[in-house]
């Protein structure tokens, strides 16, 4: 397995697909990286030469934020919003959807498991 940006990418897949295993790289960015490195997108990772792997590593490390750096930046951005207590920060603090989604009947995964309220009884008709 080739190691790029501290991630083992699979050998038996095409280069474009393998690069998407790196956090922060989608299919569009992977294709863009292949074009910059002048490597065919359809080439399998196991047939890449050492020189091609080195050029891929250099392009990814120097021009893109991936893996730990990207995760750290996202976490710091969320923390900053929480600290200044803007609307999105308050939604993060309350563990509610941030981008305007409905919460009346949905958002179970974001809100967590439903909690029973003590002392509240259902009325029988």
From Swiss-Prot:
Chain segments annotated as coiled-coil in the UniProt record: none
Keyword ATP-binding: no
Biological processes, Gene Ontology terms: translation
Keyword Phosphoprotein appears in the UniProt entry: no
InterPro entries referenced in this protein's UniProt entry, alphabetically: Rbsml_uS13_C, Ribosomal_uS13, Ribosomal_uS13-like_H2TH, Ribosomal_uS13_bac-type, Ribosomal_uS13_CS
GO annotations of cellular component type: cytosol; small ribosomal subunit
GO MF annotations, alphabetized: rRNA binding; structural constituent of ribosome; tRNA binding
Pfam families: Ribosomal_S13
Entry keywords, A to Z: Ribonucleoprotein, Ribosomal protein, RNA-binding, rRNA-binding, tRNA-binding
Quaternary structure annotation from Swiss-Prot or TrEMBL: Part of the 30S ribosomal subunit. Forms a loose heterodimer with protein S19. Forms two bridges to the 50S subunit in the 70S ribosome.
Family: Belongs to the universal ribosomal protein uS13 family.
Job description of the protein: Located at the top of the head of the 30S subunit, it contacts several helices of the 16S rRNA. In the 70S ribosome it contacts the 23S rRNA (bridge B1a) and protein L5 of the 50S subunit (bridge B1b), connecting the 2 subunits; these bridges are implicated in subunit movement. Contacts the tRNAs in the A and P-sites.
Protein name, as recorded: Small ribosomal subunit protein uS13
Annotated organism of origin: Rickettsia prowazekii (strain Madrid E)
């Amino acid at each position: 397995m080739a190691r790029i940006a501290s991630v083992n990418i699979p050998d038996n897949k095409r280069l474009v697909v393998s690069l998407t295993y790196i956090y922060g790289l989608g299919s569009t960015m992977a294709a863009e990286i292949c074009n910059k490195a002048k490597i065919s997108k359809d080439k399998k990772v196991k047939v890449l030469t050492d020189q091609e792997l080195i050029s891929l590593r250099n392009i990814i490390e120097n021009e893109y934020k991936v893996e730990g750096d990207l995760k750290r930046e996202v976490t710091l951005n969320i923390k900053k919003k929480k600290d200044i207590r803007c609307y999105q920060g308050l939604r993060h603090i309350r563990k509610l959807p941030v981008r305007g989604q409905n919460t009346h009947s949905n958002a179970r995964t974001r809100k967590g498991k439903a909690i029973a309220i003590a002392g509240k009884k259902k009325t029988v008709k």
